[in-house]
Amino acid sequence: MTSRKAVALHAAYLIVLALTGAFLLLLVAFQHALAAATESITVKWKSPVSDTVCLAMSAGGQYCGIVDKEGAVQIYGPDGKLLWRQIVKGATDVLIARNGQSVLVYSKLNPVYQEVCFFRRDGRRLWTHKVDGCVWSGAVSADGMRAAVTTGERYIYVYKPDPNRPKYRRWRLEGIGYSVLFTPDNKRVVAATWQKSRLACYDLDGKFQWRSECEPDRQYELHASADSRSILGVIPGTQYKPGAELRFWDSGGKLCWRQTLDGFDAHALVSPRSQYVAVSYASYISKKGEGIIERKVAVYQSDGRLLWEKGGLFFGPRLMALSPTGASVIVSDGEHSIYNLDRRGKILSKLDMAGGIRKAVSSEDGRRILLHCGDGWLYLMGVGQ
């Protein structure tokens, strides 16, 4: 009797073990399927375009825009439909506010066209304003209520492009405004100045808030996190003057960390919740007496610690987007393919485009990517949708 009970208990144990194993296998398979669906890259819409000099997306990624080599500005709606097309002489850059409610167009570093043009969502021109000096940089606030440009005469202009009564304020910076942005809470404007290199923050009326000093002649491209808690500065570096650099400030202008990269062509993004910074860059390595370009992508935590780095001679990643949680990084190989990498640098998904990838810009949450490819098409990509 005792022997029979032992056999029965052993059989029951084996059955439970088998069921548990089957359940775990199903759970793993489900998680893999869920991850594949969450991290997949798909084409949302596409539209034929000519050669572009600028790509832009609104906050939230609902509206997209381009400027082509002829100065034609084209704005697209959420479904990819062309909403309007306007020729703006000398245009090189377009910026779009959330929901497409205002569009800012200007010609960068052009002494002939020192004008800023504002359009409504329907393409009607609201206002054209001549500024003092060449335009160096521009920004639109996330709520669409303000726009800003900096000029070579060290001015910053902050506009309120109201269709009935447009107005602006301007004040002088302590150097040329190389890059400018609005904080995502729409309450402040931050400029990175050249020559007298520093970050300077003001309220929308021009009242000084704080400054952070930098070494002379630094030119930082600025990015703000969507939670308004941090600001990322990037020096891309060039082949002739390598030495790319990252700087990470808190919302009060305190420098939290900096990272010098032995390379050039750096592009970096900060995650919406400020936990991660991703960067791709190129560097020269010597192989058999020849200089060869090697590319890498790296992800850092908010305290500056390196999480992972991937790349090399046989895989040259270019950063395209960073997911909201920092769980994945989307890169291209500089040719036809797009990859989604997880926190360990493992490939989650891949998509091959019909033409070589020429330009790319992402939404602030990393869920949409606008591409111009060599096949003559403009693509809006969705990540995990």
Language model: regions and residue ranges:
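Short loop/turn segments that connect beta-strands within beta-propeller blades
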Residues: 77-79, 120-122, 161-164, 203-207, ...
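Short, solvent-exposed loop/turn segments at conserved positions within beta-propeller repeat blades
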Residues: 109-113, 194-195, 238-243, 288-293, ...
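Residue-level detector of Asp-centered blade-edge/turn motifs that repeat once per structural unit
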Residues: 59-60, 98-99, 142-143, 184-185, ...
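A short helix->beta-strand "capping" segment at the edge of beta-propeller domains
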Residues: 36-51
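Surface loop/turn motifs at the tips and blade-to-blade linkers of beta-strand repeat domains
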Residues: 46-50, 85-89, 129-132, 170-174, ...
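Blade-level signature of beta-propeller repeat domains, shared across WD40, Kelch, NHL, RCC1
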Residues: 354-385
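Repeated scaffold domains used in trafficking and secretory/extracellular systems
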Residues: 51-56, 90-96, 134-139, 176-181, ...
